[in-house]
């Protein structure tokens, strides 16, 4: 039998769900590009992964950090930056924890001991420390220096990656703090460590350090407004799309073919299966959204105790989840600036084949079609809510369903 304790679905914020769906290109980027290249001493930019609420950006990077730790690497916890908090203090504290994990030889090397004390001062005072008149380098440079030392220690261990994950970066609204943090991290990523190669030649190499920033789409504008090309050169930005239905179906396929293993009271293992119709029903309700996929799966699991999840149980469970799903989509719409919100609503009122920029602009009452162009561009490139083309279409299928049908009811 199945009980809530055994549910493999996790709709909770920032968890790494056991039933994993999609995001293969981002995982491949870590496994096949970023990690091997940094371990080989080849420079790779940091990664910025943005997306609307529920797109799974934080869960994705938490999974990457977990993989790094399981491979023997040193990874920070998820460093969430609350609104109004000092990111310099938060990152300084995390780097001190990494230094302890790396067992930096502070006791026998005065330089490292002095560096740790510098970072401790930053962890205590944060951005305010750099606002005081003082001699010497800016205090935030201590973060760069300590991250470089941790990277050097990882290099000595071989095949050890250092991973930092800074979350909710859109909350770093103080331009000075944001600039200092991005420069501190970027300088460590671009640092050339001089080593002696076979044959005696002195060459520079990158340290095995990876930095992931996650947050809402507006961070791209916030970082680019002041840092501009410097930020782009040091961080590669990806905005997450909805997950393809095929990937969601694949994630549930084990329930169909082999059953999901759960422990039984006798100390053995039972299997929980799923009807193909139930599989399709969960995918249809999710509309490509990781959060909604986990929510639909969880409620279907809770809707019965038998070892078979049925389509009726999916529908029964969803009745309790519909309000939460509606609130989730409404929250995304409420965050949009008025001009973008109006564009989305006008587009939704048109038949799918009539969704052209000209028709949308006319519906909005614009004098010229080009007046709607910048808004369409932002909704496509920055938010991934629509996709421009002939005709325009919705990429965020939950938003489309909410505005054009009785979903999620």
List the predicted regions and their residue ranges.
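A short, basic N-terminal segment
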Residues: 1-45, 196-199, 204, 409
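P-loop NTPase nucleotide-binding core
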Residues: 42-179, 207-209, 370
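Sensor-1/coupling segment of RecA-like P-loop NTPase cores
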Residues: 157-158, 163, 171-227
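A short helix-turn-beta junction within AAA+ P-loop NTPase domains corresponding to the substrate/partner-engaging
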Residues: 224-242
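Conserved small helical "lid"/interfacial subdomain of P-loop NTPases
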Residues: 240-278, 285, 296
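Winged-helix-like regulatory helical subdomains adjacent to P-loop NTPase cores
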Residues: 284, 288, 294-369
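Short amphipathic alpha-helical interaction segments
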Residues: 364-382, 389
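Short, amphipathic alpha-helical interaction segments positioned at domain boundaries
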Residues: 399-409
């Amino acid at each position: 039998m199945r009980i809530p304790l055994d549910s493999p679905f996790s709709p909770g914020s920032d968890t790494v769900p056991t039933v994993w769906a999609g995001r293969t290109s981002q995982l491949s980027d870590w496994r096949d590009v970023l990690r091997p290249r940094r371990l080989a001493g080849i420079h790779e930019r940091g990664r910025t992964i943005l997306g609307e609420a529920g797109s799974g950006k934080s869960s994705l990077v938490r999974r990457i950090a977990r993989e790094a730790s399981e491979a023997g690497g040193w990874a920070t916890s998820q460093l969430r930056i609350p609104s109004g908090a000092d990111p310099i203090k938060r990152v300084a504290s995390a780097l001190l924890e990494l230094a302890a994990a790396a067992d930096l030889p502070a006791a026998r090397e005065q330089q490292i001991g002095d560096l740790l004390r510098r970072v401790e001062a930053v962890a205590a005072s944060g951005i305010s420390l750099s606002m005081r008149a003082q001699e010497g380098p800016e205090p935030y440079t201590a973060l760069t220096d300590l991250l470089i030392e941790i990277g050097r220690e990882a290099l000595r261990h071989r095949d050890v990656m250092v991973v930092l994950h800074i979350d909710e970066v859109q909350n770093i609204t103080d331009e000075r703090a944001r600039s200092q943090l991005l420069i501190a991290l970027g300088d460590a990523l671009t640092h050339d460590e001089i080593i002696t190669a076979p044959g005696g030649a002195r060459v520079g190499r990158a340290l095995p350090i990876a930095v992931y920033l996650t947050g809402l789409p507006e961070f791209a504008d916030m970082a680019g407004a002041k840092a501009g090309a410097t930020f782009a050169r040091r961080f590669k930005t990806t905005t997450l799309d909805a997950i393809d239905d095929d990937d969601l179906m694949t994630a549930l396929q084990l329930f169909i073919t082999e059953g999901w293993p759960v422990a039984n009271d006798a100390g053995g293992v039972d299997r929980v299966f799923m009807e193909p119709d139930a599989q399709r029903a969960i995918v249809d309700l999710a509309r490509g959204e990781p959060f909604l996929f986990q929510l639909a799966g969880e409620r279907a699991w809770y809707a019965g105790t038998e070892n078979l999840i049925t389509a009726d149980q999916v529908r029964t469970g969803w009745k309790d989840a519909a309000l939460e799903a509606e609130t989730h989509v409404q929250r995304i719409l409420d965050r949009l600036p008025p001009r973008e919100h109006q564009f989305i609503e006008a587009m939704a009122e048109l038949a799918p084949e009539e969704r052209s920029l000209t028709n949308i602009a006319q519906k909005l009452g614009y004098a010229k079609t080009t007046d709607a162009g910048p808004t369409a561009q932002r909704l496509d490139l920055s938010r991934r809510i629509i996709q421009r083309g002939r005709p325009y279409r919705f990429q965020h299928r939950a938003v489309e369903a909410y505005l054009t049908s009785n979903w999620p009811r």
